Amino acid sequence: MMFLNDITIVITTFYSEKKVIECLKSINNKCKVIVVENSGSKKIKEKLESTYQNVDCILSKENMGYSKSNNLALKMVKTKYALVLNPDTILQKDTLENFLHACGSIKDFAILAPYIQTEEVKKHTKVPSNPIPAESVKGFAMFFNIKKFYEIGFFDENFFLYFEDIDLCRKVIKNNNKIFLLPSVKIDHKGAKSVELSDDKELEFNRNWHWMWSSFYYHKKHGGFLKAFIIFFPKLITTFAKFLIFTIFRHKNKSRIYLFRLSGLFNSMIGKKSWYRPKV
């Protein structure tokens, strides 16, 4: 028989105080929660730990990014299972129980995740009731069978943001482990709402830089440099062209966006690490 205290919840945050509090409100206090706060804010740590007795908040000395932060927490997990959540998620009352029910019926799995359907798809297809085998899942909610990761490890820490979930799923499948989507599990996800800062432009620059860096790195990792170069060289040219056009016509914000996209892609192509961090 499995219990809620068999699950540890892992949440990586960066100035996400309001969002993570809403998330924590939806989590049963029988579950241990590890929050990794990348801002280094002692105020956030004190507030979370004083409000929620089941929460340990780890402050990082630097902004480590999603992969490294999650790995730090996952290596501390002592329970059978871990649920990795984005801070902008809300669990429903039966979310954790439904995960545990699936653990009892699916004996051999590495990752479980909610089955997501858009409203348009729901109109035309019947929602399945049984677990669905999958090759990849969305990274906002990933339920880990911890023992399956002792040998293969968790996230690739070269990814700061984006593609780390797809990459991990690929590694899981390559090592003959199983991934399932669960129609019974419901988790609300707001999407792209994790960070609570007034400088939206800086966050947009950061997202664009890392999207391009991670895109090329992922394709290089799994297809080799030449294949990745063939795919992304046209994108390098078009990104540079758009940067020039927006610069000439003085669209400052769009010009900077494409400059950041260009920088992220170029740095990845020449083999530099994912070094950019939002200036906040």
Please give the residue ranges for each predicted region:
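Short, well-formed alpha-helical segments that are part of the catalytic scaffolds
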Residues: 13-29
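A conserved acidic beta->alpha catalytic loop
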Residues: 37-46
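Glycine-rich, basic loop-to-helix element that forms the pyrophosphate-binding segment
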Residues: 60-77
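Short aromatic/hydrophobic "clamp" motif used to bind/position activated sugar donors
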Residues: 82
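Conserved donor NDP-sugar-binding/catalytic core segment of glycosyltransferases
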Residues: 89-124
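A short, conserved alpha-helix in the catalytic core of glycosyltransferases
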Residues: 141-144, 148-153, 158-186
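Active-site donor/metal-binding and catalytic loop motifs
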Residues: 182-202, 215
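Non-catalytic, C-terminal membrane-associated alpha-helical segments of glycosyltransferases
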Residues: 206-214, 225-280
